[in-house]
Amino acid sequence: LLLALGLLPVVCNSNYNADLEESQIEMADTNNYLGIIFVTATERPTLAATLYRTNTPVILVNRYIHSFETHTVCIDNYKGGYIAAMHLIEKGHRRIAHIASYKGTTPQMDRIQGFQEAMQCLPRGEYRYQVYFGDGTLERGNQVARELIKNGMPYTALFVADCQIAIGIVNTLREQGFRVPTDVSILCFDDSPYINQYGLRLSTVTYNPLSMGATAVDLLAQLMSDRLSSISHVNLTPQLIQRDSVMDINKR
């Protein structure tokens, strides 16, 4: 889409390295880039200060930060967390762990809030939940699964933030003789095609990343042509896709 507008995209991967992100923003500003589409922003004072200094238009994708007001294209992460918990509750689950990703990012915190509020719709004493934080890696998924198994697998269902963590969890569960979903149900907030390489048919709460990217590019085009008179916030609704990884334990 950027190429169709006659623009050359420069892709920078920070792997959530704060110093690298800030240097990339400064590079874009120094070299008079036409815009920054920022996917990995996290709430921190130094990032906000860097963004305030830049003259380059900034669009945040799938997140916002409280300390810097700018254009955003986001999934409704609160709703996504709520949908996930309610789906598991409707399938009879009352003991559910949420394996989140990076702590402190607005998508994660909004998703956790939605998840917790759905769980708290149940009568007090009828539910148990716990939030574990990760780093979006297979290794963290392996680690969480081992910890849960060591503790006697106290949950019947896991709501997992992304496919990498989910793959790590499933691999470790299978190695230890657990069956998905017979022994443990898994619902993922990510529908990456990468997961298909592992033969997994995970139920997911998902969104269309192509739509998010296209919307961000459209906002950038409007900024370039001075067609945006105010800050724009676009919220996209997540969808539940049911596959084979959630057991309806009401039928047991």
Region roles according to the model:
Residues 1-27, 31-34, 116:
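Amphipathic helical "hinge" segments at domain boundaries
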Residues 4-5, 54, 119-126, 151-153, ...:
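Short helix-capping segments at alpha-helix termini
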Residues 11-20, 63, 73-83, 99-146, ...:
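Hinge/beta->alpha junction and helix N-cap segments in small-molecule ligand-binding domains
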Residues 16, 38-79, 83, 164, ...:
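Flexible loop/hinge segments that line or gate small-molecule binding clefts
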Residues 19-32, 140-154:
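Short, well-structured alpha-helical segments in soluble
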Residues 29-40, 97-100, 131, 152-164, ...:
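Periplasmic-binding protein-like
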Residues 94-95, 125-130, 180-186:
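Short acidic capping loops at alpha-helix termini that bridge into adjacent secondary structure
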Residues 146-252:
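Flexible loop/turn connectors
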